[in-house]
């Protein structure tokens, strides 16, 4: 099992503070994620982490799309429902400059656990 950080939202189309969905993640290239992997979700414009999800399908290609043609299903394990309360990414050792032009990056088990614990703690409040 691998651990990932999934970048959600775009600079010109950020996630809303509330009312976002966590059912699928898209990528421009074939992702290396696999069913059963775990991930932390990062809100790009907010520069914060807000959810822990399980990847529940293998990547699927939609040849009808010209951009973001690869996607996979995700299932939230714990999520903050308001991004105003999300954890700044620097607090969990994820720096926005390392995410430039990526839709996902691999996390070390230690990075994942630090982010997971912070999200679980914040969700319990």
Regions found by a protein language model. Name each.
Residues 1-3, 35-39, 48-50:
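Short, surface-exposed beta-edge/turn micro-motifs
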Residues 12, 59, 80:
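Short loop/turn segments at secondary-structure transitions that flank enzyme active sites
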Residues 48-59:
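Short beta-strand-centered aromatic/proline hotspots
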Residues 29-43:
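Short coil-to-beta transition motif at edge beta-strands of beta-rich domains
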Residues 5-21:
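Short, basic/aromatic beta-hairpin or loop at an interaction surface
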Residues 10, 43-46:
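Short glycine-rich, polar/acidic loop-and-turn segments at beta strand-coil junctions
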Residues 18, 35, 58-62:
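Non-catalytic accessory segments flanking enzymatic or RNA/DNA-binding domains
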């Amino acid at each position: 099992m691998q651990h990932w950080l999934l970048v959600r939202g775009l600079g010109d189309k950020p996630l809303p503070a509330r009312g976002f969905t966590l059912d699928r993640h898209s990528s421009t290239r074939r992702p290396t994620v696999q069913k059963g992997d775990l991930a932390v979700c990062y809100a790009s414009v907010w520069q914060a982490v807000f959810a822990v999800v399980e990847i529940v399908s293998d990547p699927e290609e939609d040849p009808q799309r010209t951009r973001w043609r690869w996607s996979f299903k995700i299932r939230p394990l714990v999520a903050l429902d308001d991004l105003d309360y999300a954890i700044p990414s620097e607090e969990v050792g994820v720096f926005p400059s390392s995410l430039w032009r990526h839709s996902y990056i691999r996390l070390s088990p230690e990075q994942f656990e630090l982010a997971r614990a912070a999200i679980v703690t914040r969700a319990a409040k």
